[in-house]
């Protein structure tokens, strides 16, 4: 066991490990140490200041799920954009579950919208489930507000995948787009631009959203594919 692993096990909550394993199918239960996210997030902020941090970021693959979660949190703290992209591209092929994928939210992305868009297009075309999911999530996080352009909706709309975690992200994206950019997003539903499952899941998630008006929800119900 490495010195870092010893420190991680010192934060272990075995009940949480069992709970997390149930939420993350496909990852062996023995891979979970069981560290709660707020605890790991606090640790990550301190660990970035240590010399061991850089060494850890180059040690792939990791043995434990919690090490992958830590890796994602550390990438999110990287302040140099080029370095952040390099580390992200190196790590993504090793991401094997939705939780590690979704924990990555690099703050530096917000300052590099133009360069980031090109990377998002590349990630979204990936055949690797979680690289594709990460790309769509980054688009959702950074381009549905003041930096929005209607053409960006084509990026997730053009994704062709039977993978559950990709399809879920496309539906999540379009439900969010309906909440934030209704006029530009609704034609994708009206014109059945998405595959049936993603179409109906988008409607379901939008109807569950407090950001969609009752009138919009009523209209969306009429657009379900039977």
Label the model's feature ranges:
Residues 1-226:
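Alpha-helical scaffold domains
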